[in-house]
């Protein structure tokens, strides 16, 4: 394919209930097979549960959870002289957000509660308090970067 120009980023509209763009992006991450109404029901159900359990603004809990899960550094493989090194690199802001959303979704899926809305609600609550599967994943990525700090001079 020709590489003439940079493809413009799509404008994502804020979600109808809270008017938040990040929540709208998260809805797209949760969505499967183009079923946006189902994803919407899951997310709004989860946020209602969060409000009941935590007695806090659900949007605030969601944003706190996202910010807690965002990774600062990650490792990338780099081949130097016949050996592969795991080189720690800083994560770009857009990727940081995407990874946080993906990890929240994955760790919510792995939970044992009945409905996805309940799983997501509990995962968001735990992540906002610095616990849970998504936080574990973030800490693991940070630990890998810390362990391979010696190779940080092999920058990309």
UniProtKB/Swiss-Prot annotation:
Residues that span the membrane, as ranges: none
GO CC term (a single one): small ribosomal subunit
Superkingdom assignment: Bacteria
Matches recorded under Gene3D superfamilies: Ribosomal protein S7 domain
Keywords: Ribonucleoprotein, Ribosomal protein, RNA-binding, rRNA-binding, tRNA-binding
A Gene Ontology BP annotation from the UniProt entry: translation
InterPro entries: Ribosomal_uS7, Ribosomal_uS7_bac/org-type, Ribosomal_uS7_CS, Ribosomal_uS7_dom, Ribosomal_uS7_dom_sf
PROSITE patterns xrefs: RIBOSOMAL_S7
GO molecular function: rRNA binding; structural constituent of ribosome; tRNA binding
Oligomer and partners: Part of the 30S ribosomal subunit. Contacts proteins S9 and S11.
Family statement: Belongs to the universal ribosomal protein uS7 family.
HAMAP family, per database record: Ribosomal_uS7_B (MF_00480_B)
Function: One of the primary rRNA binding proteins, it binds directly to 16S rRNA where it nucleates assembly of the head domain of the 30S subunit. Is located at the subunit interface close to the decoding center, probably blocks exit of the E-site tRNA.
Protein name: Small ribosomal subunit protein uS7
Name of encoding gene: rpsG
């Amino acid at each position: 394919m020709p590489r003439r120009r940079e493809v413009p980023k799509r404008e994502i509209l804020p979600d109808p209930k809270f008017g938040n763009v990040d929540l709208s992006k998260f809805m797209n991450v949760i969505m499967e097979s183009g079923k946006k109404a189902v994803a919407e029901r899951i997310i709004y159900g989860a946020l209602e549960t969060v409000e009941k359990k935590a007695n806090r603004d659900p949007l605030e809990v969601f944003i706190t959870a996202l910010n807690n899960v965002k990774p600062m550094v990650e490792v990338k493989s780099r081949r130097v002289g016949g050996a592969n090194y795991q080189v720690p690199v800083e994560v770009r802001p857009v990727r940081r957000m995407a990874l946080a959303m993906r990890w929240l979704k994955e760790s919510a899926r792995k939970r044992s509660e009945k409905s996805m809305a309940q799983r997501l609600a509990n995962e968001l609550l735990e992540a906002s308090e610095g616990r849970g599967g998504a936080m574990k994943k973030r800490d693991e990525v940070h630990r890998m970067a810390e362990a391979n700090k010696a190779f940080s001079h092999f920058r990309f």
